[in-house]
Amino acid sequence: MNTLKNKGRWIKPVLKYFGILFVLLCAPAFANECVSYKITPKITISAPTWTKEVVQPLEPMNMWHGNVVATMVDNYDIVADITSVEDGFCVGIKQVDAEIGYSNFLVQVDIRHVPNTCSYDAVLAHEDQHIREYLSVIDDFQVELHNALYSAADSVMPIFVYNSSDIDLAIEEINNKIQSHPEMVIIKQKIKADEEIRNKRIDKNDNSETLKKCFL
């Protein structure tokens, strides 16, 4: 009796082991089957409609310079190519609609500058230069952004899922792979670096002469 019980105890773990092994061995096979369903992804990139808000913090700032807080967004809408195959679905990329750029500029001006006065307008004019540079950086990198996004999207192979309920998770995984792709990481770093260079150039070339004239 003890021997039979022991055998019974071993049967379930062994069956469970073979079940797991079957899934592990078959999943790559199904994934390989999905490769044949890969298509060339279409890429579109648009810039968000941006807004500007001017505020005057209660605490004193540098009277000669304002400050711009730029909010950058990069959203990726994946249009999936879903193919029904034996035992599941292949989820690939048909199109990526990206929105990349600045959505908001928060301009801070020292509270000692009264709105609609010479000094207030002079500070705003300077900060508007920074805003124009932020926008021009995105414009100048459009080709590189498109190429980087295409390379990232084209590198992602279709993902196999067993159930239709897992398709959304597959699309989320595709999105993460695109955003973490080396070319996407590098292009964002290049944009940030160029922003810093251009903003420093504006401040370096500004001797505040326009603002100083307001106090003569």
What is the meaning of each model-derived region?
Residues V35, T51-A98, A153-L216:
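Metalloprotease/metallohydrolase-associated module, dominated by Zn2+-dependent proteases
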Residues D87-S119:
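Active-site scaffold of zinc-dependent metalloenzymes
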Residues Y17-C26:
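Bacterial N-terminal signal peptides
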Residues T117-Q129:
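Short alpha-helix carrying the canonical HExxH Zn2+-binding catalytic motif
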Residues A27-A31:
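Sec/Tat signal peptide C-region and signal peptidase I cleavage site
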Residues N32-A47:
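Short N-terminal segments immediately surrounding and downstream of signal-peptide cleavage
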Residues L4-F18:
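Bacterial N-terminal signal peptides that target proteins for export
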Residues D128-V143:
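Catalytic Zn2+-binding segment of zinc metalloproteases
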